[in-house]
Regions:
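The feature captures the beta-strand-to-loop junction immediately N-terminal to the Walker
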Residues: 36-38
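Helix-to-loop junction immediately C-terminal to a conserved catalytic motif
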Residues: 51
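Conserved ABC transporter NBD signature motif
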Residues: 59-67, 78-79
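Conserved ABC nucleotide-binding domain
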Residues: 69, 130, 136-151
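Catalytic Walker B motif of ABC-type/P-loop ATPase nucleotide-binding domains
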Residues: 174-178
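H-loop/switch region of ABC-family ATPase nucleotide-binding domains
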Residues: 209-210
Length: 238
């Protein structure tokens, strides 16, 4: 099976301190991979590099067998890689629907497309996007919340909205930073159900998580980091 993400010998140092040392792993499509490790083990730095927010000192990234040269947040998003931060990056004064629509308008491909379409086509496209947003709200358990201000949602619902915004951009690889942090047990189960549903649709999920018991129970592969190195890998295929 062709890996959706192939990470080879990634290195990163800050002021002489090695944060990542020859980090190498592959993630298979349609799976959920969990990354564990103590604070400072390199997990977040690794996700920063994959999502284009930080430049590696060395090593290579391959997405669907294609090298990612000089990754930036924009170029990575165009490929179909999306990032959800521990503290959701949403517009709290806008409605859930407007956040979803805004996400699609901010997609690089969407901005380019608007230069080549006629006004009537834009109206039709907007109707199509609204329909898509309604579908995604259902997929992320936010149906019935479309008209509500995003800032009025619970913290867990805001995380689900962030996931929905990636889906509006047709992301196929989702990087989730601590999706279970700051939410209660019921919401953890809720978020887990959404992730399981996305997996069934063929989405691939990578997550950093300190709730090791829950993350291990729903993931296909677990990677353990220590001092910037991937020390162990467990998966259901072993």
């Amino acid at each position: 099976m062709e890996a959706i993400l192939d990470v080879r010998n990634i290195n990163k140092s800050f002021n002489g301190l090695k944060v990542l040392q020859n980090a190498s792993f592959v993630v298979q499509p349609g799976t959920l991979a969990a990354f564990f490790g103590e604070n400072g083990s390199g997990k977040t730095t690794l996700f920063h590099i994959i999502s284009g927010f930080l430049k590696a000192d060395g090593g290579d990234l391959y997405y669907k067998n294609t090298p990612i040269s000089h990754p930036t947040p924009t170029s990575v998003a165009r490929l179909g890689i999306g990032r959800v931060w521990q503290n959701p990056r949403i517009c709290k004064n806008l409605s859930v629907l407007d956040n979803l629509l805004l996400a699609s308008r901010n997609h690089p491909g969407e901005r380019l497309l608007n230069y080549f379409v006629r006004p009537g086509q834009i109206i039709a496209a907007e109707k199509s996007k609204k329909s898509r947003a309604e579908d995604i709200a259902g997929e992320t358990a936010l149906d019935g919340k479309l008209g509500q201000a995003a800032g009025e949602l619970s913290f867990g619902q805001q995380k689900l909205l962030s996931i929905g915004m990636l889906l509006m951009n047709e992301a196929s690889l989702l990087l989730l930073d601590e999706p279970f942090a700051g939410v209660n047990a019921k919401m953890i189960d809720h978020i887990s159900e959404v992730m399981a549903s996305l997996k069934k649709q063929g989405k691939t999920i990578m997550m950093i998580e300190h709730n090791r018991a829950k993350a291990s129970s729903i993931s296909d592969t677990q990677f353990f980091l220590s001092k910037g190195e991937i020390m162990q890998k467990n998966d259901v295929y072993s």
